[in-house]
Amino acid sequence: MATIKEIQQRLELVTELSDSFLEEVAKDQRSGVQKAVEKRKKAIQAELDEDLRLDQMIRYEKELYQSGYQAIAGIDEVGRGPLAGPVVAAAVILPPGCKIKGLNDSKKIPKKKHQEIYQAVMDKALAVGIGLMDSDIIDKVNIYEATKLAMKEALSKLPLKPDYLLIDAMKLDVEIPQESIIKGDANSLSIAAASIVAKVTRDRLMADYDKEFPGYAFAQNAGYGTKRHLEGLEHYGVSPIHRKTFEPVKSMLG
C-alpha cells in the first residue's frame, strides 16, 4: 500500500477531476488520504474556475481579433480620487488569447500579489505605454480632463500602434476605433492589465514622494485622504504635490 506522502506527491500531478487515480484513491479510508484528495479536488476546481473567468475576460478581445483587428490596446487609469499626486494611465496590448492567472481589476487583487501580476503583464505584453498628469495639470483642467490627457499620453507612448481601443468607462477623441466599457477592468483582460500597470506605477511614484515629502504617509495611502494623511496636512500644511482644487486642501489654502 502506498504511503500517504506518496499519494500526495502523485496527486500533485493530477489535473482533471475525472482522473482515474483520483477516483481510485478516494476509496482509501485513511484520513490523511481523504484530506489530500479533497485538497487536490479544490485546487483543480479553482484552476477550472479561474480559466473560465479568464475566458470571460478575453471575450471582447477574442471577438475583435476574429473581426480582423490585430493590435488591441486596453486603457485604464489610477488616481482620480486622491488629494495628492498625479493621475496615472496605462495602455497595454496583450497577445491574442493571452491569459494571465490572477489578473483582475487591480482593486480586487491582494496587495501582496500586485508586483507579481504587474511583472507577468510586463513580461507577456506586446506593448506598454504610461502617461501621467501631475497635480498642477489636474488643478488647471480638472481631474476628468486630466485623466483623458493621461490616457492619450499613455496611448502615444505605445511602441506598437493599436488598431482598436478598449477603454474603462471613457471615450477618447482619437482617430482609432474604440469601445468604452463600464467596469472595464473587471470585464476586459487588456483593461485589467492596464489597471495593474497604472496602479503599481503610481504606488511606486507615491512611495518616492513619501521620501521627498515625509509626514503624509504617501507610501501607505498613495495620496488618498486617510486619517494619517489628514493629520499630516494639519501639521505640515499643503505640499507641492497636493491638488489645490480638492477639498479639504482647497479650504486650507483659503
From Swiss-Prot:
GO MF term (any one): RNA binding
Any one Pfam family match given in the protein's UniProt record, by short name: RNase_HII
GO cellular component: a single term: ribonuclease H2 complex
Protein's UniProt keywords contain GTP-binding: no
A GO biological-process term: mismatch repair
CC cofactor note: Manganese or magnesium. Binds 1 divalent metal ion per monomer in the absence of substrate. May bind a second metal ion after substrate binding.
Domain RNase H type-2: 70-254
Compartments (UniProt record): Cytoplasm
EC number: 3.1.26.4
Swiss-Prot/TrEMBL keywords: Cytoplasm, Endonuclease, Hydrolase, Manganese, Metal-binding, Nuclease
Keyword Cytoplasm: yes
Superkingdom in the source lineage: Bacteria
Catalytic activity: Endonucleolytic cleavage to 5'-phosphomonoester
Coiled-coil annotated spans: none
SUPFAM superfamilies: Ribonuclease H-like
Cofactor: Mn(2+); Mg(2+)
Binding-site list for a divalent metal cation: 76-77, 168
Family classification: Belongs to the RNase HII family.
Record function comment: Endonuclease that specifically degrades the RNA of RNA-DNA hybrids.
Protein name: Ribonuclease HII
